[in-house]
């Protein structure tokens, strides 16, 4: 997804990672790829503290277990707070469960709309949503979906739940859809 954004809509990344222009974004693709790769490794680090809940695959979660899951973004930032070089991932960790408009999701007190890395948070969030929704192994909260079903849900929520420009990019790029379908369903 990031590769397609960099090629087709680099203006969506202006402001992210300190880039102040499209030219700066285009001159530093590796900076974006490296940041997203590290973010993908770290964004759910708070789940390490609740592995016993995450691994409940045979039943629905209790309200207490759900509450602990909702706390994992903040728990993740606490894990990294003593490592100054990791602070750049803070917004990614906190924002990956917030809706695009910031009105839904958790943690409630994190304002993803104010983050300069908002678009990167959204790319990570959509990627995480796709991974979770298409996972057919070990889902305790629903049936796995295919990519087309996910894209339909994204389309219904564009502008509020999901970034309109990003979803329209997904909708309009058949090659990206094919690649994501393969990665999520066969790869």
Where are these regions (language model features)?
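Short, function-defining helix-loop hinge/capping sites that tune catalysis or transport
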Residues: 51-52, 136, 171
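Acidic, Mg2+-coordinating active-site segments of isoprenoid diphosphate-utilizing enzymes
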Residues: 44-57, 97-106, 131
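Acidic/His-rich, divalent-metal-binding segments that scaffold phosphate/diphosphate chemistry
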Residues: 1-70, 77-81
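Histidine/acidic-rich helix-loop-helix segments that form or flank divalent-metal centers
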Residues: 14-40, 80-125, 140-143, 151-187
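A broad detector of the eukaryotic-type serine/threonine protein kinase catalytic domain
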Residues: 74, 131-135, 155
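Conserved beta-strand-loop-short alpha-helix elements that form
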Residues: 121-135
